[in-house]
């Protein structure tokens, strides 16, 4: 179902009270997404819960959410499987008294809201089941989130992933853009950020290796060869290892040209100021591409539809050949990296307007 922001009213009628919305943050990307979105949706009052998973809680605090922590993630796979239904039950018991629930790639929120008779709006861009067989956990996830009252997805998303698993086609709503646009739109770049890097103001690129532990990755890393190929060409690299084990990948690279920070750096600041962003997964490449910063993906498996769309458009360059990638980066000029935010802001406005309309449809408000 295509929902055009242009076809919706932009002048809401006065409401008797703000709409109470429950926001559940289940993963580290959620605080940025939902802070940017809820700030753009008029006349709502949020109650926020957060799952204690990696940096989710600290990032929720960083963006300014007031929240309550409910449930946690577990390192062991067996405990992780038990943790999800346990947290779903916790949410069903403890969820606040609200008009609407919202979550992103979050079956726990959808099921808890359904159990309490509260309509839910779910946001996702992950249609991996359309591209890879045998991902039974992902197939189950899509079957569960198909039960949301509404699913909001990018136009590039394969909607049959949801409709084939029980979602009413009229409950799946698309927007002209990408999930990353929503929070990129709220980004305010810091002109002094490059001063935190040891490159004396010289251009740099960002390299983030593959997530080798992910179930969908069945390839060896090219990060060591890529780092060497880049630094051999005199290219400065900010290298973002996923764990300390990944630091070994930089051993053969020129130590004067590669910097692996001990403390976390803002990914959006890096994307804004970089000559190019190179990553073995999807999010950072999409963030950079939506800013108009050159982006390279060396993702080793099947792409999500959102990634393939950006590759097909030429917004992301994809290769698994380290030398080929280094040659591409070396060919870039300053004119190729002119980041902007106007496109992302248009998309955030569209998603916020769509969200407000869906809330109104569920609460009986007229616009």
PLM features: residue spans?
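Conserved nucleotide-sugar phosphate-binding/catalytic loop shared by glycosyltransferases and other
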Residues: 25, 42-83
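Catalytic donor nucleotide-activated moiety binding site of glycosyltransferases and closely related
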Residues: 53, 63-74, 207-209, 227-261
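A donor-sugar binding/catalytic signature common to diverse glycosyltransferases
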Residues: 101-112, 122, 270-307
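A nucleotide-sugar donor-handling region in carbohydrate enzymes
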Residues: 2, 148-219
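Haloarchaeal acidic low-complexity proteome signature biased toward cell-envelope/secretome components but also
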Residues: 1-21, 60, 193-197, 339-367
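Donor nucleotide-activated moiety binding/catalytic core segment of transferases
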Residues: 82-91, 244-284
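Catalytic binding pocket for nucleotide-activated donors in carbohydrate/polymer assembly enzymes
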Residues: 290-331
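A conserved, positively charged/aromatic
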Residues: 122, 129-153, 271
């Amino acid at each position: 179902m295509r929902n055009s922001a242009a076809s919706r009213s932009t002048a809401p009628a006065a409401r008797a009270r703000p709409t109470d919305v429950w926001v559940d943050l289940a993963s580290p990307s959620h605080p940025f997404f939902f802070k940017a979105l809820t700030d753009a949706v008029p006349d709502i009052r949020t109650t926020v819960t957060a799952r204690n998973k990696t940096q989710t809680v600290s990032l929720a605090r960083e963006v300014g959410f007031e929240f309550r922590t409910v449930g946690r993630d577990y390192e062991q796979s067996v405990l992780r499987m038990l943790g999800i239904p346990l947290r779903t039950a916790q949410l069903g018991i403890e969820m606040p008294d609200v008009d609407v629930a919202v979550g992103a790639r979050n079956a726990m929120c959808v099921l808890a809201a359904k159990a309490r008779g509260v309509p839910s709006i779910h946001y996702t861009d992950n249609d991996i089941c359309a591209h890879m067989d045998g991902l039974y956990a992902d197939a189950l996830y899509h079957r569960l989130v198909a039960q949301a009252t509404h699913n909001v997805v990018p136009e590039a998303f394969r909607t049959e992933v949801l409709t084939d698993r029980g979602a009413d086609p009229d409950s799946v709503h698309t927007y002209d853009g990408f999930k990353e646009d929503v929070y990129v739109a709220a980004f305010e770049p810091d002109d002094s950020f490059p001063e935190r890097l040891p490159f004396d103001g010289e251009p740099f690129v960002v390299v983030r290796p593959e997530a080798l532990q992910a179930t969908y990755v069945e390839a060896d890393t090219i990060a060591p060869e890529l780092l060497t190929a880049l630094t051999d060409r005199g290219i400065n690299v900010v290298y973002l290892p996923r764990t300390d084990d990944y630091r070994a990948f930089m051993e053969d690279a020129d130590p004067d040209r590669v910097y692996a920070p001990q403390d976390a750096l803002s990914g959006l600041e890096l994307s804004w100021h970089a000559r190019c962003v190179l990553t073995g997964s999807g999010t950072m490449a999409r963030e950079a591409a939506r800013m108009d910063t050159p982006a390279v993906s060396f993702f080793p498996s099947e792409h999500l539809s959102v990634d393939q769309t950006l590759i097909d458009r030429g917004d992301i360059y994809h290769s698994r050949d380290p030398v080929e990638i280094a040659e591409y980066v070396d060919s870039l000029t300053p004119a190729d990296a002119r980041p902007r935010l106007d496109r992302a802001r248009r998309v955030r406005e569209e998603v916020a307007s769509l969200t407000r309309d869906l809330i109104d449809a569920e609460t009986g408000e007229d616009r």
